[in-house]
Amino acid sequence: NDGVMMQPYLVDQVKNIDGGVIKESEPEEMASPLKKSECDVLKKMLRKVVSSGTGTKAYSSEYTVYGKTGSAEYNDDKDSHAWFIGCAEKDGKKIVVSVLVEDGGSGGSTAAPIADKVFHSFFG
């Protein structure tokens, strides 16, 4: 979204029993903390993580994926939680996913494949 920060909301739509929309949330812009040029650089880096870096297990040739892997050590034995945060897009349809696996080790080997399954399910 070119660096535009959006107002978060929890409910996209409220429908009645017949499936009619009673209320629908509308996206609202909050601020623009990044310039478009800065956002473009970040997107290239996040794309590279998935295409040739630590997040390759979230890569797909069917849609475009961007992401970042990580791990967070939680004790002196250097055991870690695994995480992946990313987004994917295809034909104007977009999804953002955050995966955290407690005691999962590496984000690339544990969390990224879970995100891949979510992306695959979303795009069909």
Where are these regions (language model features)?
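Extended C-terminal subregions enriched in glycine
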Residues: P33-R47
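Active-site beta-strand/loop architecture of penicillin-binding DD-peptidases
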Residues: N1-E29, L46-G124
